[in-house]
């Protein structure tokens, strides 16, 4: 029996499950169902916008808890992260949320309840948030709760409270992009690998919210390279969900900024095409590497300027995610992991200069600013 179990587990990791059907003759191969990975966006408040983001490829939104919205989301196959009508902290009154919990907690489209946004910035004590979480759960709420932090290091104080921990970081252009990676790394390392962690990346111009950054004048939207870099820095942690802020908020409406909107659509489409990279497991790896030029070997956050992650997807395939977190061209000299496989740059034929890497040797890999390179492991017979 143990041998059969090990065999089935090996087949499962290869992406196939074999089912013996009574009277069906030989074994039938059935594809493994990919687990749900939220690719979401904030600021979706109407059924019209819901249809628009559905067509764009999003499967999750942050939106209202009302019947018309949730029913439309269910029809489109979209999950909704919704406020219960009150936020944890001062004034968290059951009379404000009890009705919504009764009416919508059972709704199939409800993904989770948005417990509170950035309590660390508002300096709401963790004990109070934890107490309000217990109060909320006591009112028959069965769906998970979500909580958003603005600083990943505060996961040490708030991370154990919600069912789903979310971290936002919006550095463009007033902070180095490497801050995004730093906050996600802090949150993941503190919360641990078992904690559901969602990243929230910037898809807006701070000019629309300029009152929140007094004195800042260098307003602009993230470039496509920056948006892609933040996306894959999140996946490299890895995270269990990825959302973007925001579709519509105040005077901001994302489709009014076509370069950013179409760049985001391109990234969302790429995530669907390479869905095997979603929700990977991070493997232990102490890489041997050098980054040139020497004076650029560290980012503005004093971390390595190229982020390196060794991941394994649900089918057992290994990937190296290598990401330049800076605006500078860099060269990475890297010794690849030796694990009975060769490495190939994803999307490149083996006869290119970066195809067909073999383990155990030092390879020099050039990077443009914010460039993402993914090496895929191929088993050697």
Language model regions located:
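Bacterial N-terminal signal peptides that target proteins for export
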Residues: 4-15
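Bacterial N-terminal signal peptides
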Residues: 15-26
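Glycan-processing catalytic domains of CAZymes
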Residues: 30-341, 345-380
